[in-house]
């Protein structure tokens, strides 16, 4: 009934649009887009912004609209924050054992938002389009997530609140003169 995908270059979206227009015109095309990209506003409001933000999710999102773009069949776009993307990707690993990358987290988060808005059951396809093996030091690293404000530490009210990487856990790098 629907397919959720991301746009790094609109080639995939244009190809899907043309294919489903002939093969299954009832299938709804939904874009998962990082917050900061111009695509969500363009799809949902028809406004092409000249200002884009920045995002940490890799491989999807646009700061301009390439000439090849054909958004005529796209029903809706969802802007997903970096935190939502990373947390969805981590949840995909812990609950399903699938090591997807950051853009897969964006697609999953958008698909869940789309599904929650529906009033009748639908079949929804989402691709895990990138592997998480290149994100082991990023979205799958708790310290990186903490350093970038995507995870919160529980305050204990003692010195451990100031020491992020305890020596006892062999997480502290010590260099002697």
Question: Predicted segment positions?
Answer:
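Conserved acidic residues
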Residues: 1-4, 75, 122
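Surface-exposed amphipathic alpha-helices with a cationic face
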Residues: 17-24, 115
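Short glycine/serine/threonine-rich phosphate/pyrophosphate-binding segments
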Residues: 6-17, 39, 103-111, 135
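Catalytic phosphate/nucleotide-handling subdomain of diverse soluble enzymes
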Residues: 112-129, 137-149
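Short beta-strand segments
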Residues: 6-7, 31-33, 125-129
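Active-site/ligand-binding loops adjacent to catalytic centers
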Residues: 21-100, 139-177
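Redox-cofactor binding/interface segments in oxidoreductases and associated redox assembly factors
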Residues: 5, 79, 101, 126
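Terminal helix/beta-alpha structural elements that buttress the NAD(P)+-binding lobe
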Residues: 2, 98-106, 114, 151-152
